[in-house]
């Protein structure tokens, strides 16, 4: 999503929709960020507005960019939410959407462990979803990037409440178990052509840079879930190949995107 953030002019306005405590950090940003969610995040969040995505309390054409990062699958009124996004974003603005593919192992695990996990909308085709969003928001679809999993939602360090008993079937959510699981799935995908580490898609609409990296980033942090292209990572170990996440510093096993 950093590609679209870079297009926002100084003094602009950005909407982080369905974000909880926030899906990105506007460090050093020269634009304003408004965070919106149906439920309060439980911690202080600057410029937080509690609202329904299908009834946004903002004037038309107010935002230069809208980010819906893993939130469309949670909206009960998906059509209404998309119409509202189209209303509040400028015609010259941009939109970033990321969603899970409900046919993947990762989304199945998420819904099984979390007893649905709030996923009321299921998506199985990036092309179909892009067409719906483009038609509703009037923003042109410019790129789609496949997303890999890190199982960060299984990480016991990310849980405040007691983890479900089912989690012990997957190593208890320890970082060691997640390191091994993600690395093995990446290798199976590479050598056997499976889709076990595939998670979903990131879709870009509207005013986007001329070149968006639409390749699959296989290095996704097991703690914070942020993805990074392999050619921008500094390996700290040769065997096993490993890097530290630039966002949170967690040690992850490294895979080459181009292999």
Predicted feature residues:
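Conserved N-terminal segment of class I S-adenosyl-L-methionine
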Residues: 1-59, 65-68, 82, 198-201, ...
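S-adenosyl-L-methionine-dependent methyltransferase catalytic module, highlighting the catalytic core
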Residues: 76-80, 84, 94-243, 250
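Short acidic capping loops at alpha-helix termini that bridge into adjacent secondary structure
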Residues: 61-62, 92
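Flexible loop residues that form catalytic
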Residues: 22, 71, 147-149
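Short glycine-centered segments of the SAM/dcSAM-binding site in methyltransferase folds
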Residues: 13, 92-94
């Amino acid at each position: 999503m950093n590609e679209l953030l870079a297009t926002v002019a100084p003094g602009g306005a950005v909407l982080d929709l369905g974000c909880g405590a926030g899906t990105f950090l506007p460090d050093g940003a020269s634009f304003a960020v408004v965070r919106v969610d149906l439920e309060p995040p439980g911690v202080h969040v600057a410029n937080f507005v509690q609202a329904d995505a299908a009834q946004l309390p903002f004037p038309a054409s107010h935002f230069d960019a809208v980010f819906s990062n893993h939130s469309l699958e949670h909206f009960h009124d998906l059509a209404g939410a998309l119409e509202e996004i189209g209303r509040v974003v400028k015609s010259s603005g941009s939109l970033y959407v990321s969603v899970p593919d409900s046919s993947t192992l990762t989304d199945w695990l998420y819904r099984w462990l979390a007893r649905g996990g709030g996923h009321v909308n299921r998506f199985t085709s990036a092309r179909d979803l892009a067409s719906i969003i483009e038609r509703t928001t009037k923003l042109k679809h410019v790129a789609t990037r496949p997303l890999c999993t890190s199982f960060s939602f299984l990480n016991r360090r990310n849980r405040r409440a007691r983890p479900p008993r089912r989690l012990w079937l997957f190593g208890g959510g320890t970082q060691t178990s997640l390191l091994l699981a993600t690395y093995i799935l990446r290798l199976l995908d590479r050598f056997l052509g499976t889709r076990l580490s595939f998670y979903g898609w990131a879709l870009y609409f509207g005013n986007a840079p001329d070149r968006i990296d639409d390749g699959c980033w296989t290095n996704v942090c097991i703690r914070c879930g942020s993805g990074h292209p392999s050619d921008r990572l500094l390996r700290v170990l040769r065997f096993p190949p490993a890097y530290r996440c630039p966002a949170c510093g967690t040690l992850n096993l490294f895979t080459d995107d181009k292999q």
